[in-house]
Protein backbone atom coordinates (compact mmCIF):
# COMPACT_ATOMS: atom_id res chain seq x y z
CA UNK A 1 0.00 0.00 0.00
CA UNK A 2 2.80 2.39 0.84
CA UNK A 3 4.13 2.17 -2.74
CA UNK A 4 0.78 3.17 -4.29
CA UNK A 5 -0.57 6.69 -4.73
CA UNK A 6 -3.34 7.45 -2.25
CA UNK A 7 -6.83 8.49 -3.32
CA UNK A 8 -6.02 11.81 -1.64
CA UNK A 9 -3.92 12.60 -4.73
CA UNK A 10 -7.17 12.72 -6.73
CA UNK A 11 -8.75 15.45 -4.62
CA UNK A 12 -7.79 18.23 -7.05
CA UNK A 13 -9.45 16.33 -9.93
CA UNK A 14 -12.78 16.32 -8.09
CA UNK A 15 -12.56 19.90 -6.80
CA UNK A 16 -15.21 21.90 -8.69
CA UNK A 17 -15.94 19.03 -11.11
CA UNK A 18 -19.29 17.71 -12.24
CA UNK A 19 -19.03 14.05 -11.28
CA UNK A 20 -21.05 11.28 -12.87
CA UNK A 21 -21.28 8.12 -10.74
CA UNK A 22 -22.07 5.17 -13.00
CA UNK A 23 -23.41 1.86 -11.70
CA UNK A 24 -24.31 -1.22 -13.79
CA UNK A 25 -28.07 -1.20 -13.28
CA UNK A 26 -30.26 -2.15 -16.25
CA UNK A 27 -31.38 1.47 -16.77
CA UNK A 28 -27.82 2.39 -17.75
CA UNK A 29 -28.43 0.85 -21.17
CA UNK A 30 -30.94 3.59 -22.08
CA UNK A 31 -28.48 6.33 -21.09
CA UNK A 32 -25.35 5.12 -22.90
CA UNK A 33 -25.97 6.99 -26.17
CA UNK A 34 -26.51 10.32 -24.42
CA UNK A 35 -23.60 9.68 -22.08
CA UNK A 36 -21.29 9.08 -25.04
CA UNK A 37 -22.23 12.53 -26.37
CA UNK A 38 -21.65 14.41 -23.08
CA UNK A 39 -18.88 12.35 -21.49
CA UNK A 40 -16.34 15.17 -21.77
CA UNK A 41 -18.48 17.36 -19.50
CA UNK A 42 -18.08 15.05 -16.49
CA UNK A 43 -15.53 13.30 -14.38
CA UNK A 44 -16.88 9.77 -14.88
CA UNK A 45 -16.50 7.55 -11.80
CA UNK A 46 -17.73 4.04 -12.64
CA UNK A 47 -18.25 0.77 -10.84
CA UNK A 48 -15.94 -1.95 -12.15
CA UNK A 49 -19.07 -3.89 -13.15
CA UNK A 50 -20.18 -1.02 -15.43
CA UNK A 51 -16.89 -0.79 -17.33
CA UNK A 52 -17.59 -3.25 -20.15
CA UNK A 53 -20.89 -1.55 -21.00
CA UNK A 54 -19.15 1.85 -21.04
CA UNK A 55 -16.27 0.61 -23.18
CA UNK A 56 -18.69 -1.03 -25.63
CA UNK A 57 -20.44 2.35 -26.02
CA UNK A 58 -17.15 4.18 -26.64
CA UNK A 59 -17.18 5.83 -23.22
CA UNK A 60 -13.92 6.19 -21.32
CA UNK A 61 -14.43 6.59 -17.59
CA UNK A 62 -11.89 8.66 -15.69
CA UNK A 63 -11.89 6.32 -12.70
CA UNK A 64 -13.29 2.96 -11.67
CA UNK A 65 -14.10 1.88 -8.12
CA UNK A 66 -14.26 -1.36 -6.14
CA UNK A 67 -14.62 -1.95 -2.39
CA UNK A 68 -15.45 -5.62 -1.71
CA UNK A 69 -12.69 -7.59 0.07
CA UNK A 70 -13.76 -10.95 -1.38
CA UNK A 71 -12.37 -12.49 -4.55
CA UNK A 72 -14.60 -11.15 -7.30
CA UNK A 73 -11.82 -11.14 -9.88
CA UNK A 74 -14.37 -12.36 -12.45
CA UNK A 75 -15.77 -8.80 -12.35
CA UNK A 76 -12.55 -7.30 -13.71
CA UNK A 77 -13.05 -6.81 -17.46
CA UNK A 78 -10.56 -8.64 -19.63
CA UNK A 79 -10.22 -5.57 -21.80
CA UNK A 80 -7.21 -3.49 -22.84
CA UNK A 81 -9.12 -0.27 -22.03
CA UNK A 82 -8.69 -0.79 -18.28
CA UNK A 83 -5.01 0.10 -18.69
CA UNK A 84 -6.16 3.71 -19.24
CA UNK A 85 -8.43 3.90 -16.17
CA UNK A 86 -7.33 4.44 -12.57
CA UNK A 87 -8.90 2.18 -9.94
CA UNK A 88 -10.02 3.52 -6.57
CA UNK A 89 -10.20 0.65 -4.11
CA UNK A 90 -10.41 -0.21 -0.46
CA UNK A 91 -7.19 -0.90 1.39
CA UNK A 92 -8.70 -4.32 2.16
CA UNK A 93 -9.66 -5.34 -1.39
CA UNK A 94 -8.72 -8.77 -2.68
CA UNK A 95 -5.17 -8.91 -4.14
CA UNK A 96 -6.63 -9.68 -7.60
CA UNK A 97 -7.82 -6.07 -7.80
CA UNK A 98 -4.42 -4.70 -6.79
CA UNK A 99 -2.84 -6.92 -9.45
CA UNK A 100 -5.29 -6.03 -12.22
CA UNK A 101 -3.95 -4.07 -15.19
CA UNK A 102 -5.56 -0.71 -14.35
CA UNK A 103 -3.55 2.45 -15.09
CA UNK A 104 -2.85 2.80 -11.38
CA UNK A 105 -4.46 1.90 -8.08
CA UNK A 106 -5.62 4.52 -5.56
CA UNK A 107 -6.39 2.99 -2.15
CA UNK A 108 -8.79 5.02 -0.04
CA UNK A 109 -8.45 5.29 3.75
CA UNK A 110 -10.35 2.73 5.78
CA UNK A 111 -12.79 4.75 7.92
CA UNK A 112 -11.85 2.67 10.97
CA UNK A 113 -8.23 3.74 10.74
CA UNK A 114 -8.63 7.43 9.88
CA UNK A 115 -6.86 9.43 12.57
CA UNK A 116 -4.31 6.70 13.33
CA UNK A 117 -0.60 6.86 12.63
CA UNK A 118 -1.00 4.18 9.94
CA UNK A 119 -3.65 6.15 8.08
CA UNK A 120 -1.62 9.35 8.38
CA UNK A 121 1.45 7.57 6.98
CA UNK A 122 -0.50 6.22 3.99
CA UNK A 123 -2.90 9.09 3.26
CA UNK A 124 -1.69 12.15 5.15
CA UNK A 125 -3.17 13.68 8.26
CA UNK A 126 -6.22 15.27 6.62
CA UNK A 127 -7.87 12.15 5.15
CA UNK A 128 -11.66 12.30 5.44
CA UNK A 129 -13.80 9.37 6.53
CA UNK A 130 -15.03 7.89 3.27
CA UNK A 131 -17.70 5.26 3.66
CA UNK A 132 -20.73 3.76 2.07
CA UNK A 133 -22.46 0.43 1.80
CA UNK A 134 -22.19 0.36 -2.00
CA UNK A 135 -19.69 1.64 -4.53
CA UNK A 136 -22.18 4.25 -5.73
CA UNK A 137 -22.71 5.59 -2.21
CA UNK A 138 -18.97 5.58 -1.56
CA UNK A 139 -18.32 7.32 -4.89
CA UNK A 140 -20.84 10.06 -4.12
CA UNK A 141 -19.47 10.55 -0.59
CA UNK A 142 -15.93 10.74 -1.97
CA UNK A 143 -16.88 13.21 -4.71
CA UNK A 144 -18.66 15.48 -2.24
CA UNK A 145 -15.84 15.13 0.30
CA UNK A 146 -13.41 16.21 -2.41
CA UNK A 147 -15.53 19.30 -3.22
CA UNK A 148 -17.21 18.23 -6.45
CA UNK A 149 -19.54 20.89 -7.82
CA UNK A 150 -22.24 18.32 -8.57
CA UNK A 151 -22.83 14.57 -8.41
CA UNK A 152 -25.15 12.81 -10.86
CA UNK A 153 -26.06 9.13 -10.52
CA UNK A 154 -26.74 6.72 -13.43
CA UNK A 155 -27.61 3.03 -13.41
CA UNK A 156 -28.59 2.92 -9.75
CA UNK A 157 -31.55 0.54 -10.18
CA UNK A 158 -29.91 -2.71 -9.06
CA UNK A 159 -32.58 -3.56 -6.48
CA UNK A 160 -35.45 -3.79 -8.95
CA UNK A 161 -36.83 -7.33 -9.13
CA UNK A 162 -35.63 -9.20 -12.20
CA UNK A 163 -33.07 -6.56 -13.09
CA UNK A 164 -29.65 -7.73 -14.21
CA UNK A 165 -26.43 -5.82 -14.50
CA UNK A 166 -26.27 -3.96 -17.80
CA UNK A 167 -23.39 -6.22 -18.82
CA UNK A 168 -25.86 -9.12 -18.77
CA UNK A 169 -24.32 -10.88 -15.77
CA UNK A 170 -25.69 -11.17 -12.29
Language-model region placement:
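N-terminal donor/sugar-recognition subdomains of glycan-related enzymes
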Residues: 1-22, 26-43, 52-57, 72-85, ...
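Structural motif
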Residues: 19-23, 44-46, 65, 88, ...
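Gly/Ser/Thr-rich loops at beta-strand to alpha-helix junctions
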Residues: 24-28, 51, 133, 158-161
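Glycine-rich phosphate/pyrophosphate-binding loops
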Residues: 48-68, 146-166
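Short, acidic/turn-prone active-site loops that include or flank metal/cofactor-
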Residues: 48-51, 66-73, 90-94, 110-114, ...
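Acidic, Ser/Thr-rich peripheral helices and adjacent loops at domain boundaries
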Residues: 65-71, 76-85, 106-110, 166-170
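Active-site/ligand-binding-proximal alpha/beta "capping" segment
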Residues: 95-158
Amino acid sequence: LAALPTVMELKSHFDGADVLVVSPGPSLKQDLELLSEVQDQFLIFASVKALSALFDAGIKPDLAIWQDPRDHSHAIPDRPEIAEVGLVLSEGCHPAFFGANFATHFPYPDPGFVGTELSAALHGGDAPKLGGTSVSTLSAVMALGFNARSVTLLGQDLSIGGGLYVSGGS
